[in-house]
Design a protein with these regions (language model features):
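A short, flexible N-terminal coil/short beta segment enriched in small residues
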Residues: 1-27, 129-160
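ATP/pyrophosphate-binding catalytic subdomain of soluble kinases
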Residues: 133-202
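Active-site histidine-anchored catalytic micro-motif
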Residues: 44-155
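Short internal beta-strands
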Residues: 33-35, 98, 210-217
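ATP/NTP phosphate-donor binding region
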Residues: 1-63
Length: 268
């Protein structure tokens, strides 16, 4: 099993790469960390052209079985459309794993018919308990370990960071939910912002195709005055307004407990 690591958003820390290479070797997996992961160009892991070229290179490599996004941050939206165009044949034989800002690429590649999943990334090894998250991702990529999956999955599902999903809605990369369950998570946002993002997401016509919504972990930042509505009440409110069932909590989030959510198969 050969897994390529690229950084479509922000740079990967070298110590994180080294630790994950060791964990991968112990699991019998060859980790191929692209040099682009360590480039720095302002906020990004290299210019757009370099990040796109690295991703397209590993997508086209028939010797690579899976593509693992190094980390989140910001920037994958700038290359997502181009990444999913004119796909090489080898790209369709791979699985693509990531979350957070990587959700832009998950959406684009899924719409193009590729196998994608929400799940832990390489830089997560630096979190408290992060080695467990990395082992979970490696076990799923290498052998499809079902223990790594979000335990409440009972049918087709998709998972996104809420800010990323809100940015996707109304664009050519908006997910086609087509009866899938939607899992969302968020980090470091005030409740009023979460309320606003859910307003935008649930107001889009495509949201009506969601079978049900579950809420992952959301690290809420304090506002200058109390919002006055609890997190789950916010989610229930916008689900009720849109006629979509709210189905409770989900085991995903920006943390080491983050579980894997494979997106449903799709023909481009």
């Amino acid at each position: 099993m050969r897994i390529a690591v690229v950084a479509p958003s922000c740079p990967l820390k070298r110590d994180a790469a080294t630790r994950v290479e060791e964990l991968a070797a112990a699991a019998g997996v060859t980790l191929v960390v692209h040099p682009q992961c360590f480039l720095e160009d302002g906020h990004f892991a290299g210019p757009d052209a370099d990040r796109l070229a690295a991703l397209r290179e590993v997508m086209a490599d028939p010797g690579i079985d899976a593509v693992w996004f190094a980390r989140g941050g910001y920037g994958s939206n700038r290359i997502a459309v181009a990444a999913a165009n004119d796909l090489p044949a080898a790209a369709r034989a791979k699985t693509y794993l990531g979350y957070s800002d990587g959700g832009f690429l998950l959406a684009a590649l899924h719409k193009a018919g590729l196998r994608v999943a929400h799940g832990p990334m390489v830089q997560d090894v630096a979190r408290e308990g992060g080695e467990a998250a990395v082992r979970r991702a490696l076990a799923w990529l290498a052998s499809g370990d079902r223990e790594a999956l979000e335990p409440g999955l009972d049918g087709p599902a998709m998972a996104f960071n809420l800010v990323v999903l809100s940015s996707l809605m109304g664009t050519p990369l908006e997910p086609d939910f087509n009866g899938a369950e939607l899992l969302i998570e968020e980090v470091d946002e005030e409740l009023y912002r979460i309320d606003r993002f859910l307003f935008h997401v649930s107001s889009q016509p495509g949201f009506a195709a969601v079978r049900q919504l579950r809420l992952g972990r959301c690290l809420v930042r304090d506002n200058d005055r109390p919002f006055g509505i609890e997190l789950e009440a916010v989610a229930r409110h916008w689900c009720e307004r849109a006629g979509v069932r709210y189905a409770g909590r989900a085991d995903i989030g920006h943390d080491s407990l983050n579980r894997i959510v494979p997106f449903p198969s799709r023909n481009a």
